[in-house]
Structure formats: structure tokens, C-alpha cells
């Protein structure tokens, strides 16, 4: 099972109107400075890094709606997606995080 998506795939999913939740787990000020259209902010990355696996319970949503987690460079969101999958949620992390997303938007 695929556990992550790259920026190009996420962009295609958004364009196609695929029903997904994009959850940015970075701090609110980071989400405010740069964000993926349609994403929501749930600052849990620090809690996850400190070993609070239950922090992901705050972002579990509607059953059957996949979640794509986003962080700065891909590490924290990968862990968040792993923890969500342990709870039975279809979850993916954004490969390379927001950095990869921003680079994909810059074009050639």
C-alpha cells in the first residue's frame, strides 16, 4: 500500500476534485505564511515529535475520507500518517513536505 504522495500527485488529486482532507500539522504561523489550497491547520507536529502518538486523534475525521498530512520537509507528516494508519485511517504523507510543494509550484 502506498503511504505517501508526491506534490504532482497531490496537485492532480486537488484538480480532479478527489475527496481528501489535507491537514497541515505545522505551526499556525507557518501555515499562514504558505499553505496548500484547501488545507486545514492542526498543529500537532511538536506533540508527535515528543512522543505523543495520541495527538493524531485530533485530526481523525469522517470515515472513508483519506487524509494527506503536510509538514515542513516530510518527516513529521510521515510519522503522523503512520499513526493515523495504525488507527484505521487511510492516510498519506506529502513526500518532501511543504518544501516539495513550494518547489513544484515554482515551475521549470
Identify what each model region corresponds to:
Residues 1-21, 28-66, 75-108:
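Rhodanese-like catalytic fold shared by cysteine-dependent sulfurtransferases
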Residues 69-71:
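Short, surface-exposed ligand- or partner-binding patches at beta-edge/loop junctions that are enriched
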Amino acid at each position: 500500500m502506498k503511504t505517501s504522495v508526491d506534490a504532482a500527485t497531490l496537485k492532480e488529486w486537488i484538480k480532479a476534485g478527489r475527496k481528501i482532507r489535507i491537514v497541515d500539522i505545522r505551526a499556525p504561523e507557518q501555515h499562514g505564511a504558505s499553505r496548500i489550497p484547501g488545507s486545514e491547520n492542526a498543529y500537532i507536529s511538536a506533540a508527535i515529535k515528543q512522543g505523543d502518538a495520541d495527538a493524531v486523534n485530533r485530526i481523525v475525521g469522517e470515515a472513508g475520507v483519506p487524509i494527506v498530512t503536510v509538514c515542513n520537509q516530510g518527516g513529521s507528516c510521515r510519522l503522523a500518517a503512520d499513526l493515523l494508519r495504525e488507527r484505521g485511517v487511510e492516510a498519506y504523507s506529502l513526500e518532501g513536505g511543504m518544501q516539495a510543494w513550494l518547489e513544484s509550484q515554482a515551475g521549470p
